[in-house]
Swiss-Prot record:
Function: Catalytic component of the signal peptidase complex (SPC) which catalyzes the cleavage of N-terminal signal sequences from nascent proteins as they are translocated into the lumen of the endoplasmic reticulum. Specifically cleaves N-terminal signal peptides that contain a hydrophobic alpha-helix (h-region) shorter than 18-20 amino acids.
Similarity comment: Belongs to the peptidase S26B family.
EC number: 3.4.21.89
Coarse class of the protein's main subcellular location: endoplasmic reticulum
Keyword check for Kinase: no
Organism the protein comes from: Metarhizium robertsii (strain ARSEF 23 / ATCC MYA-3075)
Protein name: Signal peptidase complex catalytic subunit SEC11
Segments for region (C-terminal short (CTS) helix): 158-169
Topological category with respect to the lipid bilayer: Single-pass type II membrane protein
Compartments (UniProt record): Endoplasmic reticulum membrane
Length: 172
């Protein structure tokens, strides 16, 4: 098992292989960000506020529209609130104005009230710059791994330990 540690060249090759896997995943993420024009092209639904359209744990694919394709009422968007890190997935229920100056009001399908309480202090509506992207597709329950890792931090340690162990004992 630990014989690979006795050969420094093999250990270095395994470390490089692991680094290459991580850098490839990072490059794919950044490439997807550029292609979709979204800083976060994939998000996970963290709550039940969009049921029945989307369930907790669904993985959403986003596309950030340009100026010529305006966000429409009824469209599901993902937005960030100033001062908070968690993206929110909700439907546009009202729109005031057009173009870059349009103001949007959102609401979760499973919520009784609109999102004005979720917006930043002094903000009554969303603006175009708040939108991360519009939902163009989803994979049901694929994002549950992310939720489990967030709710149970010890799972991250276990997963990283297993990955590290696999790198050490891998034979070529």
């Amino acid at each position: 098992m630990l014989s690979s540690l006795q050969n420094p060249r093999q250990a270095a090759a395994q470390l490089m292989n692991f680094a290459m896997i991580l850098s490839t995943a990072f490059m794919m993420w950044k490439g997807l960000s550029v292609a979709t024009d979204s800083p976060s092209p994939i998000v996970v639904v963290l709550s039940g506020s969009m049921e029945p359209a989307f369930q907790r744990g669904d993985l959403l694919l986003l596309w950030n529209r340009n100026v010529w394709q305006e966000t429409a009422v009824g469209e599901v968007v993902v937005y960030n609130v100033k001062g908070k890190d968690i993206p929110i997935v909700h439907r546009v229920v009202r729109k005031f104005g057009t173009g870059d100056k349009a103001k949007l009001l959102t609401k979760g399908d499973n919520n009784n009230a609109d999102d004005t309480d979720l917006y930043a202090r002094g903000q009554d509506y969303l603006e175009r710059e708040d939108i991360i992207g519009s939902v163009i597709g989803y994979f049901p329950f694929v994002g549950y791994v992310t939720i489990l890792l967030s709710e149970h931090p010890w799972l991250k340690t276990v997963m990283l330990g297993i990955m590290g162990l696999l790198v050490v004992i891998q034979r070529e």
